[in-house]
Design a protein with these regions (language model features):
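N-terminal transmembrane alpha-helices
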Residues: 8-45, 62-74, 78, 103-110, ...
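Helix-terminus/linker motif at the lipid-water interface of multi-pass membrane proteins
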Residues: 29, 33-52, 121-128, 184-191, ...
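Small-residue-rich hydrophobic transmembrane alpha-helices
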Residues: 51-111, 148-167, 273-337, 373-395
Length: 446
């Protein structure tokens, strides 16, 4: 069991968080690798229009993924608290009911997303010359929603128990499979965006299966029929933790969709430039996500064990580590960002130069303010680990209004490049709310 779980209630907070976060960072690197390979292969083989087609669905994809990750992350909060408190019977029942709720959510999400796909693309003012390719990509990827949900719940259980190594291995497997299949389906068979979508879904299936096998090896979360029996209040408690995170992700996504609507009105070249930078956004954000997962598990376990002082030390250590990491990534982007962006773009020389200029402008703005995003993740996750998912949900509402407001108003004042500042403004508004709320909430446990 010791190889599959990690007790985060003992030992150096900074060391524990770093040991937990680093495998997740490596896993995110591999996840970004196969996302970037999708973009590079499609952009280089199928051209700028195909690249724009992928970009046009970016926020729609993020929204559907956000629903799945939101509910499972909420479930993991209670799982980590029971593990920290050593309540083994409650732990098994919580895991079992998390499986049931995840399955129901996945089925509903699959049906809704398939029905709404075309409507969303039309609503977003997707350019006529790319909407067909965008719809093909969405239809195929949406078929994999149950697979993504399975991966998310199994990975969430593992992370709640302090295991970040297994999700890393799963991401490495998925990245390797995705790269190979991209080359076969897109470059070899010339299937375009459909091939990229098939490669992604297949890779996700292998990562989900690997995490499932790993969870099966952990005795303390072995579930039987009795664990699935109705427990008064349990589903409500799980949904009470998961629903606000789900709503938070959805409202952030809706804000992103509103921004995408504005961007789509600027033409496919602007969409392509925006897309190229958004593919690197995953690289900018990957360590922040990792620290977020680490903080949720760390705070949840220590709250279950009643170790409030350790929570404070862990959050401070995480903030410092997040700042250093964001500074390093920003420097890398300023040094090599243009080279990385150029990998995504091919075609007519005049068009590619315009796309690259748009992409570089956006990337330089985000890299300059990256530390704000990292603080946002740390403090949002700390609140979630404390069992407070309402304030993080409200931070999503703040992100929505700030992002949409800036996207609609600033371009009218300084031109279309003003839309690039919508993301930074949204980060800042949410981060301020979360930091203030954390310090107010932690005093209640002192």
């Amino acid at each position: 069991m010791s190889a599959q779980v990690r007790d985060m209630t003992k030992g150096s907070p900074a060391k524990l968080i770093l040991l937990f976060a680093v495998p997740l960072m490596l896993g995110n690197i591999f996840q970004q690798l196969y996302t970037m390979v999708d973009t590079i292969v499609v952009g280089q083989v199928a051209g700028v229009q195909a690249l724009a087609a992928l970009g046009a669905v970016e926020w729609i994809m993020w929204m559907t993924l956000g629903v799945s990750t939101g509910v499972t992350q909420g479930f993991s909060i209670l799982i980590s608290q029971h593990y920290g408190a050593k309540k083994w019977n409650d732990l098994k029942k919580t895991v079992a009911h998390s499986y049931l709720l995840t399955a129901v959510t996945a089925i509903l999400l699959l049906l809704i997303s398939q029905l709404a796909a075309r409507w969303l693309l039309v609503l977003l003012n997707t350019p006529d010359n790319i909407i067909g390719m965008s719809l093909i990509y969405l239809r195929i990827v949406f078929c994999g929603i149950p697979i993504v949900a399975a991966y998310n719940i199994f990975a969430s259980v593992l992370r709640a128990l302090g295991n970040s190594r297994t999700p890393l291995i799963a991401m490495i497997i998925a990245a390797f499979i995705n790269v190979v299949l991209d080359l076969v389906f897109v470059a070899g068979f010339n299937w375009g965006v459909a091939g990229a979508a098939l490669a992604t879904v297949t890779a996700q299936a292998f990562s989900a299966f690997y995490c499932f096998l790993s969870v099966r090896k952990i005795e303390i979360v072995h579930t039987d029929r009795d664990d699935f029996a109705k427990v008064p209040g349990l589903n409500r408690k799980l949904f009470g933790l998961g629903a606000p995170i789900l709503f938070q992700n959805v409202i952030i996504s809706v804000g992103g969709l509103a921004v995408q609507f504005v961007i789509n009105g600027y033409g496919f070249l602007f969409v392509a430039g925006f897309t190229a930078t958004n593919k690197l956004y995953g690289v900018l954000e990957m360590a922040a996500i990792s620290y977020g997962y680490a903080v949720v598990s760390y705070v949840g376990q220590n709250l279950g064990a009643g170790e409030i002082t350790r929570i404070k030390k862990g959050v401070h250590a995480s903030s410092f580590l997040a700042f250093l990491t964001s500074a390093f990534i920003s420097i890398v982007m300023f040094l090599f960002g243009k080279t990385l962006l150029s990998m995504f773009i091919s075609g007519d020389t005049e068009q590619t130069s315009q796309v690259l200029a748009i992409a570089w402008h956006y990337l330089s703005i985000m890299a300059s303010c990256l530390c704000i995003l990292y603080f946002l993740y740390v403090y949002r996750s700390a609140l979630q680990g404390l069992g407070n998912t309402m304030i993080p949900m409200l931070s999503g509402v703040v992100e929505f209004f700030v992002r949409v407001g800036v996207a609609l108003l600033l371009p009218k004042l300084i031109g279309q490049n003003g839309i690039f500042y919508a993301e930074i403004a949204a980060w800042t508004g949410a981060a301020v709310l979360l930091m203030i709320s954390y310090y107010i909430n932690i005093r209640k446990f002192a």
